[in-house]
Amino acid sequence: MKRAVSGFSSITAALKIASKVGFGNFYRSITSRNTCKTCALGMGGQKGGMTNEVSSFPEICKKSIQTQLTDIQQAIPESFFQDNTIADFKQITPRKLERLGRLNTPLYKKRESNQYIPISWNKALKKIFATLQTTDPERTFFYSSGRSSNEAAFLLQLFVRVYGTNNINNCSYYCHQASGVGLSATIGSGTATVVLEDLRQSDMIWVIGANPSSNHPRLLTELLRCRRRGGKVIIVNPIKEPGLVRFNVPSDWRSMLLGDNEIATDFVQPNIGGDIALFKGIAKVLIESGNIDMAFIEDHTSGYQGYAQDIMETSWTDIIKSSAIDRAQINHLADLYL
């Protein structure tokens, strides 16, 4: 795969968005002191926009630009809701819905109606208040967007606690609850243990079941830097995403002009759901070869003997069939890990 993604096309896309909302609004948005609403690789907070946590500049991505500028679009005219039914909304693509404008007035739908009706804030608050008054707080659950701002999330949880319950969560609950429980049970923390500074000192980075080129493009800068200092980037993904093979980083002139944009040193494509078998295979190679740090395991883990027994009882035939990765490639990955 020779063609790289992003680069000048991303810059062009950002400028198109800027032209719609005004270049003044665009500049104020990308240089403001805030955090990015799209992924955990933040915007530097009080260091200001386009400066990341370790003071690198310029650091920004088109997803961040799209999200921020969506918030400063022109308001959706009230007449739009009068002219369109809910059935009409179902025919509009998500992309067009996002580009309709900014929702700046409460909408109300009567049970028998097929339309949203714009109402005043006073009316909306009275309706909400009337419902809250007749509802037991312990029988309520407040669910918000993981893409809302930190300020909005703080105010919502504060309101919910004043109301009398702690039944609150956001869409990240569905995304990360399973992994959070699993991580808590195994490493003692439900969240990541890696920070940006760690990536900049890593000799090898494994990207497993993730698509940073689509969902958090700024991580690609760190992967590219790892390659340039002689490190390795191992991608484990059933889909061979172009952005994880070659990626033009818009803020990097070598990437943009010289084609220095290779990301993956190894791109491993197991069956969907075959990642467990793949990592069992890597572990089996390590155990069989005796390349295990038993002192570390005894000091910092529990249940190793049961784990090792399960690994050794799993046949190579089952591992290769389930993962769709041959023995030679599994041996190669184990050698890289060592």
At which residue positions do the language-model features occur?
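Cofactor-pocket helix-loop regions in the catalytic cores of large enzyme subunits
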Residues: 1-9, 101-338
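Iron-sulfur-cluster electron-transfer modules
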Residues: 25-49, 57-157, 182
